[in-house]
């Protein structure tokens, strides 16, 4: 399978960040954002150049926190920007992969929706993604936890229907279909932190989701020592 991979999409939070939540500094090995991004650069440099990598920011990454977010600023790590096969995009972003339209969004607004909508939870992120598609807006609640920049145009509106909707943020790998749209939450590579436990997040880390762009069939590789829970919604 690995030999057939042509694209890698990273939906934000490349790093843990600095000062994101109380006492975070006690958990960090790399204490600066530059050190953390250098680790990312070193890891991504192991990916062959024929594979294109798309990187968007999340709320733990450096740069503007308010949505929509510009790409991670070059001043924090110029090496990522200078790689021929790396494309730094904003949050949200719409990209085309061999004619397949992919809408990428880190997913900060999931926090607001889970808190205000009965029946939705962090454990089932694709249900929240359906809510966003129905609303035709990626951050439909204003004035809550998610900061939204006062732009002249609302760039969070979903104008075009994507083929694939890719979200992150909640550290839960999960997939589903909704009206012909493939919904993917790409999960995380980090085990549960004390902060995540305090807000009710239960990650299933170490799961790589791989999409066949011709058939839309999804494969997964589990790099976690724990048995894989069902990531397919009914």
Residue ranges and their predicted role:
Residues 1-234:
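Extended recognition/assembly regions associated with phosphoester-bond processing machinery
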